Amino acid sequence: MSNQNTLRDVALAAAALCAAMSVIVPAVAAEKAATKPAGTYVSGDFHNHTTCSDGALSLQRLVDRSVNAYSLDWFVQADHGGSSARNCTLREDPFEPVAPALGLTNSATGPYGGTVTYPSGGQPASTGKGPNQSWQSTLPNGVADIKGDGTANPKRMWRWQEIKEFQYPVLEAESRKHNKPVWIGLETNNPGHEHTSTTILTGQLPWPKTGAGNANLMAQFEYCFDRSDTDTSRGAENQWDCSVSGSPNNSLIDPVSRKIAKAGNLGGGNSAANPDLGHIKSVEAVKWMNEKAPNTSFYVPAHLERAGVYNPTANRGFNIEHLRNFNNAAPRIAFGFESMPGHQAQEDRGGYGTGAAGGGTFGGTGAYAGLIGGVWDALLGEGRNWFFFASSDYHNRGSFGADQRETNSDFFPGEYTKDHVMVRKGKGKGDLTAEGIIDGLRSGNSYVANGDVIDRLSFVVCTANPGLPIKANQALIEKAAANAVANKGEVRIDGCATMGEKLVARPGADLIVAVAVRDPQGKNNSPYSFPNPSLKQIGVTQPLDKPELDHVDLIGGLVTGYVSPADTARYAGPIGTDAASNKSAKILKVFNKTNWTAGNDGVRTMSYRVPAVKASQYMRLRGTNLPAATPFETDAQGNPLSDWEASPVDQTVKGNIACADAACPPHMRTVAGVKYSSFDVAAWSDLWFYSNPVFVEVINGVKVAGVK
């Protein structure tokens, strides 16, 4: 909001609200407003890849694209565990930019015409150049500099050595070069399951820190707990031990490698001979993190629906009991999941085939969070601190080069998906530090948005002042939310709680839910300005690079308390079972242009009353650019449909949403001369945001035990 009078009015309204709230029905949030440090929302990404695993770019170039080209405020680089032959610390060779070089080509048939030959895999096109060169050929002493087991030629370097000796120093230098927190994590191939995004910050010194740090603990974690790391050297000169103090599972540790392993199963994963061994090892990993770095670590299962339901004799999938086990073992370490995967521009969106748990993605989100009443709602219904995150999972742009804006695989970090995280000031940590970001992720005070469908959010639940009319309560709290959005902050008023917090209220109190979002004006990062083909079906002409928020759903459910592991029927089971469901979850309210207030700078404010609250509960938000009943995209209630509805599995048949504009690019699914929404066009057409929950605990009711 640029109007000075408007800002003054909002500030006065917020001050009036503070006075009004002083006589509110007694309630508390996570902290009193006067003692809770102020903060701001900052955006970042913690799951992406370089040539040190299966990515296409060097460390330096990926960092630059993420924090410079796409302006992320923070960045965690997280390659896979295991080993790699390629040296990702080597920069790309100098080259003449390959057309279109950050632009789009022109031809007689439209701005994306097929007359240009693109280099396969991007720049560098040769596998023998830049970061595609091997460690063996680029280290001073060749193979002698590569530690641990292995006889391949060229010899592969174990990920622990890459992290400790090569990648960390580069990332520390990049962090200080860009004056932003940049540090190293790991997408671990977790035993018994598929992949998990992790970090251990202890030892690392990203900007604004100074001095020479280290990633020794991160490297040790990879050696100890990645199922693709079958090295037995104990980290060579490090002589690491992977035991957890006092754990009965230390009896499973192999005496040579000093990690949980079996003969013929050095990764310690599930197998027919060792069912569930992998999951046991993954729980030990969480416990080890909690012992070694309880305040500077996280363990966030990635694209967890992708590999299908859990199999005790294989390494795939996560059922709800595994998430509960992780959270029970260390709630400060395992506090959420990436149910919105990366790879959003792939034909099978997110890389989710029909064998994924739930059968695919729904508006780009996996079934665990994308379907109301499912796994996420079941966890929130226990009152757990289990939060929603997303990532780019950047590897490459498919058949396009890194400097081309089209993609039929991945988006760069910050190009399409952003995690917006509250980072607080003070507490001796400065304004923006890696520690503050990890604290923010752990707090649950965060939200995710694709395609900048929104770029700011304030979401708060307050007890109403019984001395004021309800409409006056709502107006005041809406003003406070709008003021918070204008300042990229949150509402900080006694008697209110925001995302990741709980409000404790007396039974019978009225609650006010207030939301303010900013639908940013102007263009997002989409390279396409032709009309959104999904909306064109219903007669709406809206450029793909100028999306507009259509509606916001307020979703809620009851909190009924933690389920005991002994209650197997309610604790364990795949998607769709009672254990993985919360039947109380539903849409409480839909906000759109008919009932929200449109303000300056794209700000939309809205509110909802919960009269005479009786039961402990939670509320969360989602929103989209697509109206309810958009064919092949949303149902009559506005829920996202399976992404296979728009783009069928069989790639040889026509899609269901035609792209008839002359500017529709040639790489789209094309059958009988007709182009159909697919790849990046489908992703830019179908945008969603998700907030994390606000909890309400009713006095003498069910405790929201997982949230302070």
Residue positions per predicted region:
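Extended, charged catalytic domains and RNA/DNA-binding interfaces, predominantly
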Residues: 29-708
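Gram-negative bacterial Sec-dependent N-terminal signal peptides
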Residues: 1-28
